Design a protein with these regions (language model features):
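Flexible, acidic/histidine-containing loops and adjacent segments that form or flank the divalent-metal
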Residues: 1-2, 81-214
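Conserved Rossmann-like nucleotide-binding pocket used by diverse enzymes
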Residues: 5, 72, 97
Length: 214
């Protein structure tokens, strides 16, 4: 049986995909991790009885999920990667698949420091910093990382009944994304590059197509 949970993370996205058999988990994949905050100005406060919001990591615990076969990050907006740290507190991950992996031993990006950058550029630094910090502060929780080049569609068949494709949107942008992000971690702060990429960073995203024959 294929089970899809669209997790109510508030202003963000996170989806849990599981194949279950006899109450046992045969395969589990999380697509995105939601925001790092549930409290938003345009939503009811958390003490409101109508609120059913939950962090993705807390939802995984609630469902008894302690291991993910695959974690897919479609892009690096805060409402998609902000909850990564909480997810890694809750589960171990066999594979992380995304469009960019930070350099080994990368340090903080300090988005709120005295860098003279405009808001859009700082926002890009902040999003990537949250992502990299979550990986850095949870060593050993992810067995391996796969940076998808965008050159080909990834086909996976984790079980006989379940297969899926990870499709890359506008793969020509992936090398540029890597160049801009790598420069960040080298301490370079190109105002134009950061502003430009901050406005189009969701263009180089991933799309998932599921096939189930259970």
């Amino acid at each position: 049986m294929l089970v899809l949970d669209f997790i109510n993370v508030g202003n963000g996205d996170s989806m849990l995909i599981r194949e279950m058999e006899g109450g046992e988990q045969r395969f589990a994949m999380l697509v995105d991790c939601g925001h790092d905050k549930l409290e938003r100005d345009d939503h009811p406060p958390l003490n409101d009885a109508r609120s059913c919001r939950i962090f993705a990591g807390d939802f995984l615990r609630q469902q008894g999920v302690s291991r993910l076969d695959l974690l897919v990050l479609t892009h690096f907006h805060r409402d998609h990667i902000g909850g990564l740290g909480r997810v890694l507190e809750a589960v171990t991950v066999d594979e992380l698949a995304c469009t960019y992996l930070p350099p080994a031993h990368s340090g903080p990006l300090d988005p709120d420091g005295d860098n003279g950058l405009p808001k859009a550029a700082r926002n890009l630094l902040r999003c990537v910093d949250i992502y990299a910090e979550a990986l850095r502060s949870h060593p050993g929780r992810i067995a391996r990382g796969t940076a998808l080049s965008g050159a080909v569609t990834e086909f996976r068949q984790p079980t006989p009944a379940l297969s899926f494709e990870i499709q890359c949107n506008d793969p020509a942008l992936y090398p540029r994304q890597k160049a801009v992000y790598d420069a960040m971690f080298r301490g370079e702060r190109n105002r134009y590059d950061l502003m430009h990429w901050g406005k189009c960073m969701n263009v180089s995203s991933l799309h998932l197509r599921l096939h189930y024959h259970g």
